[in-house]
Amino acid sequence: MVERTILEAVKKVIEESPKRNFSESVDLAINLKNLDMNQPKNRVDEEVILPHGLGKELKIGVFAKGDVGLRAKAAGAAYVISDVELEELAADKNKARVLANECDLFIAETQFMPIIGKNLGIVLGPRGKMPIPLMPNKDIGELIQSKQNAVKLRSKDRLTFHVAVGRRNMNPDDLSENIETIMSRLERVLDKGKHNLRSVYVTTTMGKSERVV
């Protein structure tokens, strides 16, 4: 059951923000308190599966070859990078940066991981886009599908951070349930739960914001 205050805030933001000629992202601005963010244990680094997804298709890059690469492409991967192409990226950091900015996330067969870490870590690491390892017993199609509905909560060393919860053209109830899912995870992982939340606002990309916490 969606909390009325969250649903009301979502509806108000959508209704009162000027309409754009593109589908705006709906985000949460999360402000923490009473935490020493110099201590890694206090930093938020969580993946959350949203019940209603983000309302858009994520661009996923997959480092794979052979049958896994073919199945990744069939499952909707935007890019499938072979071992030969990985070598090319390692030799051309500008090309690697373009790919890193183009993709929302990456998945890699485990045998690719050491090479990626050594040659592309400097590009992917700071962007929070180091690949998710594809374990031998995991189906690439299922993994791609699950990641389409996933978001990362990453505070790094800051008390304030943002996370997307969907698109403006989504149903307000669906957006609200996505927000509740994120809030529930946050309260579980923070040292003092909701008492470590100074405030949380819902906002559109270029619109107004409304407080939900």
Swiss-Prot record:
The keyword rRNA-binding applies. InterPro entries: Ribosomal_uL1, Ribosomal_uL1-like, Ribosomal_uL1/biogenesis, Ribosomal_uL1_3-a/b-sand, Ribosomal_uL1_arc, Ribosomal_uL1_CS. One of its GO terms (biological process) is translation. One of its GO terms (cellular component) is large ribosomal subunit. Gene3D superfamilies: 3.30.190.20, 3.40.50.790. GO terms for molecular function: rRNA binding; structural constituent of ribosome; tRNA binding. Keywords: Repressor, Ribonucleoprotein, Ribosomal protein, RNA-binding, rRNA-binding, Translation regulation, tRNA-binding. The keyword tRNA-binding applies. It holds the Pfam family Ribosomal_L1. SUPFAM superfamilies: Ribosomal protein L1. Disulfide bonds: none annotated. Coiled coil: none annotated. Belongs to the universal ribosomal protein uL1 family. Binds directly to 23S rRNA. Probably involved in E site tRNA release. Protein L1 is also a translational repressor protein, it controls the translation of its operon by binding to its mRNA. Part of the 50S ribosomal subunit. This is Large ribosomal subunit protein uL1.
